[in-house]
Amino acid sequence: MTRRPVALALLLVVLTGCSTGSDQPSSSSTPSATTQTTTSQPDTRTPKPPPAPGVDSCYRLSYAQAVAPTARTEAVPCRRGHTAETFHVGRLDRVLDGRLLAVDSHRLQEQVATTCPKLLGERVGGTEEQRRLSMLRSVWFTPTLKQSDAGADWFRCDAVALARSTELLELTGSLSGVLGTEEGRDRFGMCGTAEPGTAGFVRVACAQSHTWRALRTVTLPGSDYPGESAAKRAGEEPCKAAARTNAPDPLDFQWGYEWPTAAQWAAGQAYGICWAPA
């Protein structure tokens, strides 16, 4: 039996006025010079907000586009290759104490960053544990400043699958309920290219070539970070037991454990991950 506990790597309208004029011919038979003055009346109509995105829309996004605060790409048919699927469109709470908040304010960005991850499970299915052990993530977008100035007040939540840390997996069809199936968990599960903690280790979707797989998570108790030593100790026995159960020979097996860092704990990740050879 060999083991390698390691610290968990950080996851992760433009309105245009137009006027026309007509030249009035002189009543005199003698040509004469004429002067014309054209005035443009201001358009006092209320701008119409741009339409909100639609739920169940799909997009071809790069990783950089997926983690940007706004999205400018057009939707594509979901039956074709894509990398993101919209599972929720909500409304921003833009008024606070009678003031209209900017779309890029911390409060509104926090609203979206909290809402979308909570709703991901309604789209992809599975248990909380199965979602933790997957490479499926939620990303979110708000209107651009220009769209917001025109009245847009929506936010959009998309589901994506990480092929690896900074690369999205190409998708076809819908992610609806995918983690409720063994096939979906095998495709989108969390795997590794080598033993966690070694130089060759890269976290990948299990659809990719891999040699290790995440087996379970270990939730750490309390609201305060317990410290590195306690976080490390908390996972050793649970991970060893999970690897033993998964191994062909319960007397000869390998296991690994990644525990959360203080920074990850502060970001909301209060669990470690157990690994074993695939």
Describe each model-derived feature in a short phrase.
Residues 1-11:
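N-terminal export and membrane-targeting signals
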Residues 19-278:
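Primary mode marks residue(s) on the alpha4-beta5-alpha5 output face of response regulator receiver
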Residues 14-17:
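C-terminal motif of bacterial Sec signal peptides marking the signal peptidase cleavage site
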